[in-house]
Amino acid sequence: MKKFEQLRGIVAPLDRANIDTDAIIPKQFLKSIKRSGFGQNLFDEWRYLDYGEPGKDAASRQLNPDFILNQSRYQGAKILVTRDNFGCGSSREHAPWALQDYGFAVIIAPSFADIFYNNCFKIGLLPIVLESPVVDRLIRDALTVDGYQLEINLEAQTVMALSGETYWFEVDHFRKHCLLNGLDEIGLTLQHADRIRKFEINRRNEQPWLFL
Amino acid sequence: MKTLYDKLWNGHVVHAESDDPNGMVILYIDRHLVHEVTSPQAFENLKLSGRRPWRTDSILAVADHNVPTTDRSSGISDPISRLQVETLSQNCEEFAITEFKMDDERQGIVHVIGPEQGATLPGMTVVCGDSHTSTHGAFACLAFGIGTSEVEHVLATQCLVARKSKTMLVKVEGNLGQGVTAKDIALAIIGEIGTAGGTGHAIEFAGNAIRSLSMEGRMTLCNMAIEAGARAGMIGVDDVTINYIKGRPFAPRKDLWDRAVTYWRTLKSDEDAVFDHIVELKAENIKPQVTWGTSPEMVTTIDGYVPDPADISDPIKRHNIEHALEYMGLKPGTPIQDIALDKIFIGSCTNSRIEDLRAAAEIVKGKRIAPNIKLAMVVPGSGLVKSMAETEGLDRIFQAAGFEWREPGCSMCLAMNDDKLLPGERCASTSNRNFEGRQGPGGRTHLVSPSMAAAAAISGHFVDVRSFAH
């Protein structure tokens, strides 16, 4: 996994609650057996006026001028600010893949769906929970101030506006450690291989029917 | 003093990284269910890292999302879908993993076949790269959906790095009215607590209305726990659980069976267990439910009306409702029973088991679908459900009524195969999600129980199944 460095970037607002993973990356793109290339179909049904299909050249498609991410001021945005329960629905990791492939490195919301939140950390995309009134302000500023940026410091667990206002966020210690160092979680678990084997032997003795 | 969740969690902790009870632990996984959509990248990375599956006998694989529900003799026509299904088979062959292929009668929706085979047993941790893995919690399992990186993690280590959830008890006491099903309980709960109500929690369902449900009904309920935001839903073991499992292919036999049952009987919350949250519903108050919006929490009763956003004071909620009504093409104040339909879908990991098909068949028996219904389809959850239904003559009842009788798979629940809604089409669906575009771009989904979907097919619009003439 890629290390999460300190980051400063343009903020794109998506003022809507309960954005589900079907909206983030529609199911027809889930037929791919690859991990990359989902960015061009991020929010496909909102972003384009025509129906998207795998293999369709994005350059030939009709952009929806009313969709906020299509506005020129949000091009190159690295930070998405959105509403409650972002990423609800299916467990598809294709959703964080698509967000990351599009260029987002940080998603800020008052709350996230559990599986989505968990999936983000596995690929080095940072989901940040901030209180609703703070998110209100960030969305308002991103809508009104041209080129509005935020600076994210994972080490210090802060989100800083260029005006100097700083908001602290919580993140699990282990997840932070993995992100900051770009660690391979599987490798970390395999350091406990002996413990896993021992656990498994006990389990086999106590509940042999689980090993039929 | 322990909850069922505590017992399941504690029994699977291999190693705790710290003394913090809310810290990350290494959690052992007993059963890994695998399907074609969320596994190819996991297998690919596993191989690129020079690793192998830790315990192949814990894995059961099946292709369900992409498979056609029409004639399968010539395979899958869409080359991208075909490649994904073939990739699953190649991975399973390479590592000698048990897979039920498309021509195997045991093939079906992963959350139907696990329990059907007895591959889901009480006390297990069950994971799958699919959010509806919560279904298996009906068997007093700790079962939850994971992403592809975690699929790879479980393949490589038989474990996950996880953090304990909070607990929520949802208690439903009393007697369910005639025509009211597990699906209606699930939607009523989501209507009450919202789609984020269970976020960060594992839900245990309890109370005599839950005890009165069959295993099929309990699976429907736990299946929808994720739509309430909870990764896991679960129900303690009782005779209903044990009777369902007995004799299934992967279930223990003879001495081992007795030993297992003795242990399984302990898998329920202690009388004095403490939960972080408790939600109580009275079964008598639950009526047949119909969703009207683009989130499962946008739900009302069959005698209800489409809400008016003008009545909502919270601006974000109001905005969401306006957006949903526009997408759904519905006017505020419309009686639910006046909503006319184009298509009917009976199927999905929520409602495609034999009991669901029986309930729907009972409604349509001797009747015809309404002329405005362009397509009504029944997609059994597995080949075995299909053949049992055929033995009972249900296929003939459905077909005589004008329904199509299909091959098993996820089908129009998420429309990854050819079964989909066209833009603007309105569907009464027994599936679990009414998100925008879920059943096809521009499609409009109303979630209901199987008997409500069947009654809607006959009437051409929603109708109260409690007063529907048999």
UniProtKB/Swiss-Prot annotation, chain A:
It catalyses: (2R,3S)-3-isopropylmalate = (2S)-2-isopropylmalate. GO terms for molecular function: 3-isopropylmalate dehydratase activity. It is an enzyme of class 4 (lyase). GO terms for cellular component: 3-isopropylmalate dehydratase complex. Pathway: Amino-acid biosynthesis; L-leucine biosynthesis; L-leucine from 3-methyl-2-oxobutanoate: step 2/4. It holds the Pfam family Aconitase_C. Gene3D superfamilies: Aconitase, domain 4 (3.20.19.10). Its EC number is 4.2.1.33. One of its GO terms (biological process) is L-leucine biosynthetic process. Keywords: Amino-acid biosynthesis, Branched-chain amino acid biosynthesis, Leucine biosynthesis, Lyase. InterPro entries: 3-IsopropMal_deHydase_ssu (IPR004431), Aconitase/3IPM_dehydase_swvl (IPR015928), AconitaseA/IPMdHydase_ssu_swvl (IPR000573), IPMI_Swivel (IPR033940), LeuD (IPR050075). Belongs to the LeuD family. LeuD type 1 subfamily. Heterodimer of LeuC and LeuD. Catalyzes the isomerization between 2-isopropylmalate and 3-isopropylmalate, via the formation of 2-isopropylmaleate. NCBIfam families: leuD, PRK01641.1. This is 3-isopropylmalate dehydratase small subunit. The gene is leuD.
